[in-house]
Amino acid sequence: EFQTDFELYIDGIIGKVTATELGVWPGLEAFIVRTPAPAPGAVDLVGMPLSPVASAGSDAPELPEDAGQGTGKRVVYQRSSQRVWAIDEDEQVVRSYLVSGSRYRNEVPGWHKVYSRSESALGWDLQADLPYMIRYTQTERGHIGFHAIPSWRDSGEKLQTIEELGQRLSGGCTRQAPQDAEFLWSFADVGTRVLVL
């Protein structure tokens, strides 16, 4: 009942997601693979600058076993590790980076397709700017997608820091460092497949 009341993933009497929300899950950081910050000026496989939480090619963490190997260009988002991989047609990891996904159970696992994009969007409450919004699914509460870390419209203050990426902090969408959001904007056109694990 607690999980349903607070819209958490129902994962047992007190499973990982509920325990994480309560702040009582031991070793939560063990699920998050933090790669060393790239060297100044480092770029990914298509020449775009890497963020402090990004890596590319052989420096990227290994893809999860269930990441749809052999299925072509796609974006893979693994909720447990709070990580995204962008994979090209040749099965190369163009870029991988930490994100901040939803605290709630509104990230629908499975295959999706990008169906809408907005270079600038507003949050559901019209209080926050969401740069580089890429939508891939919709729930009864609204669109779910990837975007840069939002900022409050009235003050311009960011809702979180880049250092906080890797933690579930959003209300639904997947937050990215600005450089990673700009990269994904160039990589994921309408029709690009998204796999949520």
Language-model features, listed with the residues they occupy:
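Secondary-structure transition/capping residues
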Residues: 10, 29, 33, 191-195
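Generic anion/oxyanion-binding catalytic loop in active/binding sites
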Residues: 8, 73, 170
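Exported/periplasmic cell-wall-interacting domains
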Residues: 13, 68-70, 107-111, 118-197
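Short acidic, glycine/serine/threonine-rich helix-capping segments at coil-helix boundaries
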Residues: 1-24, 31
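Cell wall/extracellular polymer interaction/catalysis modules
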Residues: 18-120, 131-133
